[in-house]
């Protein structure tokens, strides 16, 4: 049996944060070089505002600073941005969004609307199917 531990590289996207307004939470740019698979995992804690919605956007590009960023086409997503988006009712939940496009760089953004209270959230990227295994531990 092949293990998962030596074949993934987790990356921080959005550090755990308490969001109390409608400021977009723009994630770290993820570089896929050396990996053929990418999955974003979004985690929520307590979402206090009873009117809040949180919309997920995934962008891609070839420039390392994503100056050429464009929204990822639906055909290059595993799952949908709508399924990864959430409302105030999603306390303590986990959502996922996969990428199967061919661009080197991607970035996840979570944009709140109607949010005026503490909303706890975080996101990580899991790079998989490495060209070279085992992957570094601890992750680079």
Segments from the language model and where they lie:
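Non-cytosolic beta-sandwich-type ligand-binding/adhesion modules
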Residues: 49-91
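C-terminal interaction-tip segments
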Residues: 1-12, 112-140
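Short amphipathic, basic-aromatic surface patches that mediate peripheral association
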Residues: 28, 36-48
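Beta-sandwich interaction modules
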Residues: 25, 76-116, 123
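Extended extracellular/luminal ectodomain segments enriched in beta-structured repeat modules
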Residues: 32-39, 103-105
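Extended, low-complexity, turn-rich repeat/linker tracts enriched in Gly/Pro/Ser/Thr and Asp/Glu
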Residues: 45-53, 114-118
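Residue-level signal for short segments within beta-strands and strand-turn junctions
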Residues: 44, 58-62, 112
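Solvent-exposed, flexible loop/coil segments flanking beta-strands in beta-rich domains
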Residues: 1-34
């Amino acid at each position: 049996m092949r293990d998962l531990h030596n074949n993934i590289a987790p990356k921080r996207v959005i550090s755990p944060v308490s969001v109390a307004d409608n400021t977009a939470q723009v994630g770290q740019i993820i570089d896929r070089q050396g990996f053929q698979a990418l999955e974003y995992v979004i985690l929520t804690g307590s979402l206090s505002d009873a009117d809040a919605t949180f919309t997920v956007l995934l962008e891609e590009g070839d420039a390392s600073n994503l100056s050429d960023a464009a929204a990822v086409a639906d055909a290059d997503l595993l799952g949908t941005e709508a399924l990864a988006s959430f409302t105030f009712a999603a306390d303590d939940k986990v959502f996922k969004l996969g990428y199967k496009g061919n661009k080197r760089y991607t970035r996840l953004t979570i944009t709140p609307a109607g949010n005026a209270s503490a909303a706890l959230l975080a996101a990580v990227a899991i790079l998989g199917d490495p060209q070279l295994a085992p992957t570094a531990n601890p992750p680079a």
